[in-house]
From Swiss-Prot:
It comes from the Bacteria. One of its GO terms (molecular function) is ATP binding. GO terms for cellular component: cytoplasm. CDD domains: PPAT (cd02163). Its cofactor is Mg(2+). It comes from Shewanella baltica (strain OS185). Pfam families: CTP_transf_like. InterPro entries: Cyt_trans-like, PPAT, Rossmann-like_a/b/a_fold. This is Phosphopantetheine adenylyltransferase. Reversibly transfers an adenylyl group from ATP to 4'-phosphopantetheine, yielding dephospho-CoA (dPCoA) and pyrophosphate. The lineage of its organism: Bacteria, Pseudomonadati, Pseudomonadota, Gammaproteobacteria, Alteromonadales.
Amino acid sequence: MHTRAIYPGTFDPITNGHADLIERAAKLFKHVIIGIAANPSKQPRFTLEERVELVNRVTAHLDNVEVVGFSGLLVDFAKEQKASVLVRGLRAVSDFEYEFQLANMNRRLSPDLESVFLTPAEENSFISSTLVKEVALHGGDVNQFVHSEVATALAAKLKLAKP
């Protein structure tokens, strides 16, 4: 175990599916960097700083995990962090085509950067940040899909957003 890996994403918010993949990646790699993207093409509910804080809380028990916000190209962030592996999650066959294209683009931009795909535990295979936000927005209980601190933060965020 000698590799630095990056698990990139928007994490808006971090779900139990994300947390499961982070825990498993932490067992596979010496150091895992959770790269939280400041993706300008998306309009996240949580600020970059809030997302970094929530992921830090959820992963606090993992000594070899570091949480870093970033903007720009993922391959540049990987070089900056001296990472040689990208960890990506595949929930369903529908994720594969996009992830395959992304892996090939990343390989073209940075030939030494390898993509590794992990599938979630069955109980997490349907969870997405988008679905969690939708359930919460309509008053549903999201505690089975996210860490309790995330559920609390999401409820507060949605309450503030209501007119």
